[in-house]
Amino acid sequence: MALNLEQKKAMVAEITDIANQAVSAVAADYRGLTVSEMSDLRKSAREARVHMRVYRNTLARRAFKETTYACLEEVLTGPIVLFFSQEEPGAAARLIEKFIKEHERLEVKGLALGGELLPAEKLKAVARLPSREEALSQLAAVLLAPVTKLVRTLNEPIAQVARVMAAVRDQKAA
C-alpha cells in the first residue's frame, strides 16, 4: 500500500510521539510468525500495556532521529516489529521473553534503554527488571530495615525484664 506524503508525515509524528513517551523499546524480526501468532502477540501486548506495531523502517528511522531511540536505527532492517514500554522498562522484554518460550521464530534484534542500544542477549536481564510496584516495595523495605532494627533493640531490655519477671513468677508458683 502506497502512502502519500501527508500520511507518511502523520506516521512519523505518531512514531515520534510514542517513542518520546516510552521508557524502553525492543525491535524484533517477526519473519515466520503466522497471523494467529501475531494476533496472540498483539493481544498479549495490549494486556501488558506495551505498544506494539509494525512500521516502515524508513519512517521509523526518520522518527527516531528526534528521540532517544536513534540508537535503534542500525537494527531496522528487514521485517521489524517495534515494542514500546510506556510505564515499566522491563514490560516489553518480559512480554517478548514469554512469547519466545512458546514461539521461537520471533528474533530480537536489539533493545533500547536510556538511549543506549543493548544487544539481544540482554533481553533476559531487562526482563528481570522489577516492576514499579516491586521496586517501590524493595525500596521501602530497605528504608524500613534500620528503623525496625532500632525498635527491636530498644524493646529488648524491656522484654528481658518481662522474661525475668515471668521466670520469678513461675518459680514462686512452683
Curated annotation (Swiss-Prot):
Q: Name one GO cellular component term.
A: cytosolic large ribosomal subunit
Q: Name one GO biological process term.
A: translation
Which keywords describe this protein according to UniProt? Ribonucleoprotein, Ribosomal protein, RNA-binding, rRNA-binding
Q: Which GO terms describe its molecular function?
A: large ribosomal subunit rRNA binding; structural constituent of ribosome
What do we know about how this protein assembles, alone or with others?
Part of the ribosomal stalk of the 50S ribosomal subunit. The N-terminus interacts with L11 and the large rRNA to form the base of the stalk. The C-terminus forms an elongated spine to which L12 dimers bind in a sequential fashion forming a multimeric L10(L12)X complex.
Query: What HAMAP family does the entry give?
Result: Ribosomal_uL10
Query: What function is annotated for this protein?
Result: Forms part of the ribosomal stalk, playing a central role in the interaction of the ribosome with GTP-bound translation factors.
The record's comment on protein family reads: Belongs to the universal ribosomal protein uL10 family.
Q: What is this protein called?
A: Large ribosomal subunit protein uL10
Annotated organism of origin:
Coxiella burnetii (strain RSA 493 / Nine Mile phase I)
